[in-house]
C-alpha cells in the first residue's frame, strides 16, 4: 500500500465530517426512522453504503486521468467545491427543509423501498458528488494508488457513513 495510516485517518475524519453535515440522506433516513423505526431505516443505510461505493471509485478511476492532464484545474475545483459546501451550509441554516407529508415516497414501507431510496439519495446527492470529485483528490495522490489502496478508501467511504446512519437511526 502506498497510502499511509495518517492519510487514511484524515480521510476517515473527512468522511465523518461529510456525514455530519445534513443533506438528502439525512432527510430520507429521518423520515423512514420516524415513520417505521429502525427496521424501516436500516435498509436505507445499506442502500446508502452501496451507493457510497460508486462515487469514490468513479472519482479515483476517472480523476486519475483528468488529474494527470488538468492538475491545475483541479486545484481550482477544490476551492470551488469548498465554497459551494459553505454556501450549502448557510442555505441549510437559513431555510431548513420543508416538513414531509405522511404519504411521502421516502416513507413507503418495505426493505426494497428503503434500499432503493438509500441508493438514489446518495447517487443524486450533490454534497457527495462535490466531496468525491472535488475533495477526495486532496487527500491522496491518485496516480500512486494501488488496488489495495483503492479497496481501503472505498471501504472507509462506505463504512463511516453507514455507521453514522445506523447510529442515527437507532437514536431516533
Q: Where are the regions a protein language model picked out?
A:
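Alpha-helical transmembrane segments and their lipid-water interface positions
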Residues: 51-63, 85-89, 128-129, 161-172
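Selective transmembrane alpha-helices of multi-pass membrane proteins
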Residues: 69-100, 157-170
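Juxtamembrane transmembrane-helix termini in multi-pass membrane transport proteins
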Residues: 2-75, 134-153, 169
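Short, solvent-exposed loop/helix junctions and linker helices
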Residues: 70, 80, 109-113, 145
Amino acid at each position: 500500500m502506498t497510502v499511509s495510516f495518517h492519510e487514511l485517518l484524515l480521510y476517515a475524519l473527512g468522511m465523518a465530517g461529510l456525514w455530519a453535515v445534513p443533506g438528502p440522506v439525512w432527510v430520507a433516513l429521518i423520515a423512514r426512522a420516524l415513520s417505521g423505526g429502525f427496521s424501516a431505516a436500516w435498509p436505507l443505510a445499506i442502500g446508502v453504503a452501496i451507493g457510497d461505493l460508486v462515487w469514490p471509485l468513479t472519482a479515483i478511476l476517472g480523476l486519475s486521468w483528468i488529474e494527470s492532464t488538468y492538475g491545475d484545474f483541479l486545484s481550482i475545483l477544490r476551492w470551488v467545491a469548498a465554497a459551494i459546501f459553505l454556501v450549502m451550509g448557510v442555505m441549510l441554516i437559513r431555510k431548513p427543509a420543508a416538513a414531509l407529508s405522511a404519504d411521502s415516497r421516502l416513507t413507503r414501507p418495505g426493505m426494497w423501498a428503503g434500499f432503493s431510496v438509500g441508493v438514489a439519495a446518495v447517487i443524486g446527492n450533490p454534497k457527495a458528488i462535490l466531496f468525491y470529485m472535488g475533495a477526495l483528490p486532496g487527500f491522496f495522490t491518485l496516480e500512486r494508488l494501488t488496488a489495495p489502496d483503492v479497496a481501503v478508501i472505498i471501504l472507509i467511504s462506505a463504512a463511516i457513513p453507514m455507521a453514522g446512519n445506523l447510529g442515527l437511526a437507532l437514536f431516533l
